[in-house]
């Protein structure tokens, strides 16, 4: 009898199969065609006209504002009072729309959904991102801790009022069932309805999935950033939500405690990795696009992220294979001339140069490695390798003529650049394309005919290497 494969071979095979499964095709870019989008969703519209501090935001693929008065934007955030009849308790402890999902009329909720969606997204034809930001309660019962325990208490009271003779453990079990069932129905009905009304938008819930890896405060010395196993399992309980979503919107807001530390990168990396795991696990033939919410400053402070933390947030998200990042901010960014001037200086000095670098590096990798039909994904998620323009090959130069971008990269591809990309990154193809370099076009295949070949990878590399590649916006 022949000996079977050794443990090393078996492990390698398992890892290879696992990694191949991870790289399901995903949705193509919906805005500029870039594989990695950087969006500015900060209410800075008053800096120029009101406070006389104009901001140059042309480096961002999308510019939007989360403020109430803005409609028909490429990114629309539906806060709790902007979409349907979201049940909750207000800050005074008063019940709103029944308090818990068990008390909501889905019929009345759907009726209000249509009115609000049509107000904020006024045409069916436009494509964009639609983010539902409901944070008062969580659909998994056990996650409603601390101030969210009010939703469990009311759920228990509802059951106890109907069954006063039941023992406490039975009341808790029934309350959990009723709450989770109603929460699931409420969220699913919401997604199904809004997708039908605005089908060209990508819909999902903000902060889903979460990783619950905030234990750096208690365990700084031993902090790894990993998502607790129990929270990964609880995310899998939400398979019904991932199956109905068309995009995922995790959050990686950095507390100043994590500033310029390895823990900051670990915090972000595992949150994004968990979102990407969920994105590829719950759909048979494709992976959901992941758009990562971050802030240009640290949480609760108007202090711009350091260069190290821009790499740990924007750079890490790009290298892991996210579809983009959304830089979000609130009204605190534009309270005075001083805050606007601080943002202007920070944009010019650090943020815009880094955004331009990463935006073009991801596009460059997509063209060189994936024929422009996919995005580059780090082979080893834990590696310290990023999609940055090589300083030996490219430089950023300012635009001078009217209408020119603030910065543009100029340079040419080198063999060292090609080798670096091939060694550290591989392709995740867009839907309709396959192959190691996304060279097979399935969109043109019909009736068993062989797929169209998008071109030899080696030929494209030789051509790129031969060209003096000048990047212009």
Swiss-Prot record:
Outcome after substituting residue 425 to V: In MCCS; likely pathogenic; strongly decreased expression at the cell surface
Reactions catalysed according to its record: Random hydrolysis of (1->4)-linkages between N-acetyl-beta-D-glucosamine and D-glucuronate residues in hyaluronate
Phenotype for residue 148 to R: In MCCS; likely pathogenic
Enzyme Commission numbers on file: 3.2.1.35
Lipidation, GPI-anchor amidated glycine type: 448
Subcellular location: Cell membrane
Record keywords, A-Z: Cell membrane, Disease variant, Disulfide bond, EGF-like domain, Glycoprotein, Glycosidase, GPI-anchor, Hydrolase, Lipoprotein, Membrane, Receptor, Signal
Active-site residues (renumbered): 135
CC terms in the record's Gene Ontology section: apical plasma membrane; cell surface; cytoplasm; cytoplasmic vesicle; cytosol; endocytic vesicle; endoplasmic reticulum; external side of plasma membrane
Prosegment residue ranges: 449-473
Domain of life the protein comes from: Eukaryota
Secretion signal, residue range per the UniProt entry: 1-20
Membrane topology: Lipid-anchor; GPI-anchor
Documented effect of changing residue 204 to A: In MCCS; uncertain significance; decreased expression at the cell surface
Disulfide bridges in this chain: 47-340, 211-227, 365-376, 370-427, 429-438
Pfam families, A to Z: Glyco_hydro_56
Result when mutating residue 64 to T: In MCCS; uncertain significance
Positions of glycan attachment: 74, 103, 357
Swiss-Prot/TrEMBL GO biological process terms: carbohydrate metabolic process; cartilage development; cellular response to fibroblast growth factor stimulus; cellular response to interleukin-1; cellular response to transforming growth factor beta stimulus; cellular response to tumor necrosis factor; cellular response to UV-B; defense response to virus
Domain EGF-like, chain residue ranges per copy: 361-439
Described purpose of this protein according to its UniProt entry: Catalyzes hyaluronan degradation into small fragments that are endocytosed and degraded in lysosomes by HYAL1 and exoglycosidases. Essential for the breakdown of extracellular matrix hyaluronan.
Family affiliation: Belongs to the glycosyl hydrolase 56 family.
Subunit relationships: Interacts with MST1R.
Record's disease association: Muggenthaler-Chowdhury-Chioza syndrome: An autosomal recessive disorder characterized by distinctive craniofacial dysmorphism with frontal bossing, hypertelorism, a broad and flattened nasal tip, and cupped ears with superior helices. Other common but variable clinical manifestations are unilateral or bilateral cleft lip and palate, congenital cardiac anomalies, ocular features including mild to severe myopia and cataracts, single palmar crease, and pectus excavatum.
Name of the molecule in the record: Hyaluronidase-2
């Amino acid at each position: 009898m022949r000996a079977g494969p050794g443990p090393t071979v078996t492990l390698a095979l398992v890892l290879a199969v696992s990694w191949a499964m991870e790289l399901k095709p995903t949705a193509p870019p919906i805005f500029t065609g870039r594989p990695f989008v950087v969006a500015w969703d900060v209410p800075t519209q008053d800096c120029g006209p009101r406070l006389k501090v104009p901001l140059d935001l042309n480096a961002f693929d999308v510019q939007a504002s989360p403020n109430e008065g803005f409609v028909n934007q490429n990114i629309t955030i539906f806060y709790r009072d902007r979409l349907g009849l979201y049940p909750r308790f207000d800050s005074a402890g008063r019940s709103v729309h029944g308090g818990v999902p068990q008390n909501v009329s889905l019929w009345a909720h759907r009726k209000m959904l249509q009115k609000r969606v049509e107000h904020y997204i006024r045409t069916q034809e436009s494509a964009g991102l639609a983010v539902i930001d409901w944070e008062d309660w969580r659909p998994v019962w056990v996650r409603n801790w601390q101030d969210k325990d009010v939703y469990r208490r009311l759920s228990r009271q509802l059951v106890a009022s109907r069954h006063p003779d039941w023992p406490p453990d039975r009341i808790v079990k029934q309350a959990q069932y009723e709450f989770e069932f109603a929460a699931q129905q409420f969220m699913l009905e919401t997604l199904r309805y809004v997708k039908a009304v605005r089908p060209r938008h990508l819909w999902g819930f903000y902060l889903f999935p979460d990783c619950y890896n905030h234990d750096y405060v208690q365990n700084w010395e031993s902090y790894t950033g990993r998502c607790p196993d129990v929270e990964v399992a609880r995310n899998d309980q939400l398979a019904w939500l991932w199956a109905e979503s068309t995009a995922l919107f995790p959050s990686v807001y950095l507390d100043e405690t994590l500033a310029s530390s390895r823990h900051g990168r670990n915090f972000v990396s595992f949150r994004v990795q968990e979102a990407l795991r969920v994105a590829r696990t719950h759909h048979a033939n494709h992976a959901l696009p992941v758009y990562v919410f971050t802030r240009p400053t640290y949480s609760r402070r108007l202090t711009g992220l350091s260069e190290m933390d821009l790499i740990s947030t924007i750079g890490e998200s790009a290298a892991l294979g996210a579809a983009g990042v959304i830089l979000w901010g609130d009204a605190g960014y534009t309270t005075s001339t001083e805050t606007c001037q601080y943002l202007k200086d920070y944009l010019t000095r650090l943020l815009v140069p880094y955004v331009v670098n990463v935006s073009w590096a991801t596009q460059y990798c997509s063209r060189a490695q994936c024929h422009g039909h996919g995005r580059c994904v780090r082979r080893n998620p834990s590696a310290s390798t990023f999609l940055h323009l090589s300083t030996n090959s490219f430089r950023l130069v300012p635009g001078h003529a009217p209408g020119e971008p603030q910065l543009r990269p100029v340079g040419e591809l080198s063999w060292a650049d090609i080798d670096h990309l091939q060694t550290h990154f591989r392709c995740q193809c867009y839907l309709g394309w396959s192959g190691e370099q996304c060279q097979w076009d399935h969109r043109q295949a019909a009736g068993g005919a062989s797929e169209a070949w998008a071109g030899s990878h080696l030929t494209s590399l030789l051509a790129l290497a031969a060209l003096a590649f000048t990047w212009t916006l």
